[in-house]
């Protein structure tokens, strides 16, 4: 399959601010649809806490759901999982650039993350798996996410670049720790 990293927030106004060099949301959606049309499964991601509105989050989820519904109807394949996590503001470029700017509230804490997981599970009903993001939230919050609609704790990571580039410090968990989290 094709990993769905790079989606961040599929809303033009937010994406232009947080990652202007990554291109428009329609490009990410087009690439995912092309992969699905070729028979590849894909995953979808969502980073929250950039100062986006609830409406922006719903628009992101709706774009993913629309593509999922279309791909399932046309190709009988689509996204197999959805993974959301909060931006790690303390140590990444976006957080440093916007620290103290007061133009919007940055970040998303555990409660907001868990609420987003629950809403994602309800909204993305045709995506089989919602993954708990232990690499960004830690195993304790990931365990709570499993009670909020997530059904996948992910896996141990041998070599990981996307989440670690976001500045998180929680990317280490052993197989035993993950088993303990889900049992």
Describe the role of every protein-language-model region:
Residues 1-40, 47-71, 97-108, 167-169:
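Conserved non-cysteine loop/helix-boundary elements of the Radical SAM core domain that shape
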Residues 30-42, 119-129:
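A structural motif corresponding to the C-terminal end of an alpha-helix
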Residues 61-65, 69-183:
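Auxiliary Fe-S-binding modules of radical SAM enzymes
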């Amino acid at each position: 399959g094709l990993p769905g990293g790079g989606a961040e927030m599929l809303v033009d106004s937010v994406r232009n601010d947080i990652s202007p060099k990554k291109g428009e949301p329609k490009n990410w959606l087009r690439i995912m649809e092309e992969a699905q049309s070729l028979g590849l499964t894909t995953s979808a991601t969502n980073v929250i806490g950039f100062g986006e509105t609830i409406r922006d989050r719903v628009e992101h989820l709706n774009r993913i759901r629309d593509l999922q519904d279309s791909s399932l109807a046309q190709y009988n394949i689509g996204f197999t999982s959805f993974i959301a996590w909060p931006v790690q503001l303390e140590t990444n470029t976006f957080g440093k650039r916007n620290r103290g700017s007061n133009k919007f509230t940055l970040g998303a804490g555990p409660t907001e993350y868990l609420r987003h997981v629950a809403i994602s599970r309800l909204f993305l009903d045709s995506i089989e798996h919602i993954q708990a993001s232990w690499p960004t939230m830690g195993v304790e919050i990931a365990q709570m996410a499993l009670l909020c609609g997530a059904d996948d704790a992910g896996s141990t990571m041998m070599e990981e670049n996307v989440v670690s580039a976001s500045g998180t410090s929680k990317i280490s968990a052993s197989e035993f720790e993950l088993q303990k989290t889900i049992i």
